[in-house]
């Protein structure tokens, strides 16, 4: 199957999406030439890119947060599928930050960049997940040809034995495709630690972050995007 044939199958009519612009940082017009490598190198760079640029969608992540893991995954998938166009990469593999993906949403991105975007949202929400690359039985079966995100139901230990959810922005159904082989890369942020030997600052002191402003901004954004998700 050619790149053009894949694009015909996976392209969709996307929504306007402008109501999310204020929730996503603008790209800084940076282009970094990375090493040449196989798909394993691609996934390793995807992991680095997500952990480097996840704050670009910190505000959006609060809008995509659901009441459960399932609802959160459904909202992320719905956003990716209906607000960002698909476009297969050629020989050159594009590893996009979420800001770059959003800027190019009408031209399209491929499965790697959908996965980076989903991973960035999940990292902001503190949700453990994996970037999964697979071999598909009916498409170049000897090669790893697709990548997406899986989210374990068990967020305590992050293991997949208790079941998991899939986030695949390339398809409307969001069902995991058949595969003959898989490789998973675990994604979770290491939390910052601060050693203290002083009184805990009281609320209202200079330097203490204001929760009122943040909650007001989040509430305003929620009102603007209300009704965008069918659940």
At which residue positions do the language-model features occur?
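A structural boundary/capping signal
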Residues: 1-231
């Amino acid at each position: 199957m050619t790149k053009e044939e894949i694009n015909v199958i996976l392209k969709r009519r996307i929504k306007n999406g402008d109501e999310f612009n204020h929730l996503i940082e603008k790209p800084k017009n940076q282009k970094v030439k990375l090493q040449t490598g196989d798909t394993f190198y691609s996934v390793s760079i995807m992991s680095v890119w997500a952990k480097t640029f996840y704050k670009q969608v910190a505000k959006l992540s609060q809008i995509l947060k659901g009441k459960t893991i399932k609802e959160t995954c459904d909202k992320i998938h719905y956003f990716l599928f209906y607000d960002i166009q698909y476009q297969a990469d050629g020989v050159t593999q594009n590893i996009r930050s979420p800001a770059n993906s959003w800027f190019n949403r009408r031209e399209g991105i491929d499965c790697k960049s959908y996965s980076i975007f989903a991973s960035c949202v999940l990292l902001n929400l503190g949700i453990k997940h994996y970037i999964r690359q697979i071999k598909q039985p009916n498409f170049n079966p000897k090669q790893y040809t697709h990548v997406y995100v899986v989210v374990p139901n068990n967020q305590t230990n992050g293991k997949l034995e208790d079941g998991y959810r899939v986030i695949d922005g390339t398809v409307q159904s969001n069902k995991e495709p058949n595969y003959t082989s898989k490789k998973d890369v675990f994604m979770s942020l290491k939390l910052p630690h601060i050693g203290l030997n002083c009184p805990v600052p009281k609320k209202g002191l200079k330097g203490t972050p204001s929760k009122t402003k943040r909650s007001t901004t989040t509430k305003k954004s929620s009102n603007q995007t209300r009704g965008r998700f069918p659940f």
